[in-house]
UniProtKB/Swiss-Prot annotation:
Keywords: Cytoplasm, Endoplasmic reticulum, Membrane, Selenocysteine, Transmembrane, Transmembrane helix. Residues 1-13, 79-120 have a biased composition (Basic and acidic residues). The chain crosses the membrane at residues 30-50. It is found in: Endoplasmic reticulum membrane; Cytoplasm. This is Selenoprotein S. Involved in the degradation process of misfolded endoplasmic reticulum (ER) luminal proteins. Participates in the transfer of misfolded proteins from the ER to the cytosol, where they are destroyed by the proteasome in a ubiquitin-dependent manner. GO terms for cellular component: cytoplasmic microtubule; Derlin-1 retrotranslocation complex; Derlin-1-VIMP complex. GO terms for biological process: endoplasmic reticulum unfolded protein response; retrograde protein transport, ER to cytosol. Pfam families: Selenoprotein_S. PANTHER family: SELENOPROTEIN S.
Length: 190
């Protein structure tokens, strides 16, 4: 018991002092010098993450509220569907028209090929060459084209004189060819 009384006396003998946090300063300073940048970047990252989450939450709330408002407006949905259907119908009609035009062209080409084969067969039966009759038909079309253009052909002048040689530099005007310099352009030999 006396030991306990002695401990109390010692505590009572020491006047109470205000304890400050100066004993933490060296450890905090050491921690900040070692990990200060990591701590700063971590705080900035957390701040940016919070901002991003707030934006995404607010955008989902506005989408859900606007989606519910659109769902309540049945008339606009019906009008949009009808416009979409009319657009699809119009595009399908255009495609059908193009397909019909293509089929017509194909039919005409097949008819032309069939007619040419018949003409070739008939000419072979008569003992004539099919190519000869094709050349005659081509000459007839050329004669018709030449008769429609009455312009006489003029003699063309040659572009260069007959003595021109691009390698010799003769008859060259202001520029002539010269070989390039030898060696490095910046100079300086090892």
């Amino acid at each position: 018991m006396e030991a306990e009384d002695g401990a109390r006396v010692r505590n009572e003998d020491v006047p109470p002092q205000n304890q400050d946090l100066s004993f933490l300063q060296p450890s905090v300073t050491a921690f900040m010098s070692e990990y200060g940048w990591y701590l700063l970047f971590g705080c900035v990252g957390v701040y940016l993450l919070i901002q991003h989450l707030r934006k995404s939450r607010s955008s989902t709330q506005t989408r859900s509220s606007s989606g519910s408002a659109e769902a309540h407006d049945v008339g606009s949905v019906v009008r949009r569907q009808e416009a979409l259907e009319a657009s699809r119908r119009r595009m399908q009609e255009e495609q059908d028209a193009r397909a019909a035009e293509f089929r017509e062209k194909q039919r005409m080409l097949e008819e032309e090929k069939r007619r040419q084969k018949i003409e070739m067969w008939d000419s072979m039966q008569e003992g004539k060459s099919y190519k000869g009759s094709a050349k005659v038909a081509q000459q007839n079309t050329e004669e018709a084209a030449s008769s429609s253009s009455l312009r006489p052909k003029t003699e063309k002048k040659p572009l260069r004189s007959s003595g021109y040689s691009p390698l010799s530099g003769d008859a060259g005007g202001s520029c002539s060819w010269r070989p390039g310099r030898r060696g490095p352009s910046a100079g300086g030999u090892g």
